Amino acid sequence: MDLPGKPGSCWVANAPATSYPRFEQSDRADVAVVGGGIVGLTTAYLLMTAGCTVTLLEALKVGQQVTGRSTAKITSQHALIYADLIERLGLERARLYAEANHGGAEFIAGCVRNLDIECEFERKDAYAYADRSQSRNAIEAEAEAARKLGFAADVVDAAPLPFRTQGALRFTSQAQFNPMQYLVALARAISEGGGKIFENTRVDDVSRQRGGRRWQVKAARSYVTAERVVIATNIPMWGPIHFDVRLRPRCHTAMAFRTDSRSVVDGIFIGVDEPSHSIRMGRDAEGPLLIVLGESFITGHDGDVARRFRDLETWVRDNFSVREVAWRWVNEDYDSPDRVPYAGELSGKGSGMYVGTGFNGWGISNGTAAAMLIADQIQGLNNPWRALYKPTRRAPKDFNRGGDSQSIVDAIGRIAPNEGGVIEHRRRKLAVWKDESGTPRALSASCTHLGCTVTWNNADRTWDCPCHGSMFTCDGKVIHGPAVKPLEPARLP
């Protein structure tokens, strides 16, 4: 499926490349960190500066997965959330959420300043805007809730956008940045401070050392042995709690458009009505970009993701003056049932294991706050957000109901070149894809996490699990967990 723009994130394209070695020789550390996004790197940085020995293992390249594909808004304004949190959790817990995200945002600003990081950091006002007049009351209620929590929130009659809106909630002095440039600099600070970072190192298992209290983190034939382990992998794959039923995977399409102006919009924006769009300016090496995210959808539940890109491009061209599409990508995140992340130490059999997950699309501030909490817990320090983010709190068992493959076809002949589909052969489902020449190749269609049948993503040419959000390349390699093993090869019928 031909789509405009280069596949990939503009943030990754406009950041220095990293070249940390592969982990090949066993090691010991105070803390092992699995995952090199904003949670893992922030945790490692905090612990390194506190005097801990830290080893961080990243399956691919640091920062390039979820964080490097976000809209990178540094804000405690998360659309319409505070009125809902006050109603469901009470004023004090809502206040803790507000304080945690404000704290995370200010920590980033402090790192940019203190480490002299060049990452396109800019202060911007944040707007949650309404397309429909019926949503004005919800915006007013959210502003009132935000003010109860200490935010200087106000309501404006129209968002500063080139299309009509029905009012907007405004938080002043929020921020935006290039998350990849920030994380590359954070990784450099960790490495220069004595921390160890390894890339292209997929962890196979995390378990207690036999007969001991230390943890063993296994990658290929080597181990990191550590007193504490932090699982910062978007969704935890190991530990006594099954987060795959406590979290729901969701994706967004994103497109970056070339524009003749650096200020097509001034601010960071998110719509409160469906279909919602997230809007901000950015840039790459060739100049300014307008970056827009489309509406969310559950991973693996759409058999035509390419259509979502076409619809998003149409919406942007209808509402903005832009040129060609420069970049396009899909990002994945996980939602929690109460809109609050899970972060901190797992109790009981998980003692000494820490997680950060379920950021509900707001991982820049929430992920940083989670890292601050985890680092405090490891150091034995009190943290006021501990009870709010508690990863062992109760959750409904049916929050994530999973789904079925959206790519079932009745014959290989129905699969076009550069496309994929799932066929059934001798009671076994096969994931079949064709290269440009039309040559077919086959894999097992069973996700290696729990066996759900995968869906072909015709935009990214990936196999996506509709149950728990694992993603695989067209030839079966793991991109996102919770799966840790590739799709099994299979013979064509």
Indicate where each model-derived feature is located:
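N-terminal Rossmann-like FAD-binding beta1-loop-alpha1 element of flavoenzymes
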Residues: 29-56
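Helical element adjacent to the flavin cofactor pocket in flavoenzyme catalytic cores
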Residues: 137, 144-147, 169-227
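Flavin-dependent oxidoreductases
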Residues: 205-282, 413, 422
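Extreme N-terminal leader/targeting segments of oxidoreductases
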Residues: 1-31, 49, 477, 487-490
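C-terminal catalytic lobe of FAD-dependent flavoproteins
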Residues: 273-274, 298-303, 307-399, 443
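Flavin (FAD/FMN) cofactor-binding and adjacent substrate-gating region
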Residues: 2-14, 80-86, 109-185
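Rieske [2Fe-2S] iron-sulfur-binding domain
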Residues: 255, 424-493
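Glycine-rich FAD pyrophosphate-binding loop
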Residues: 49-69
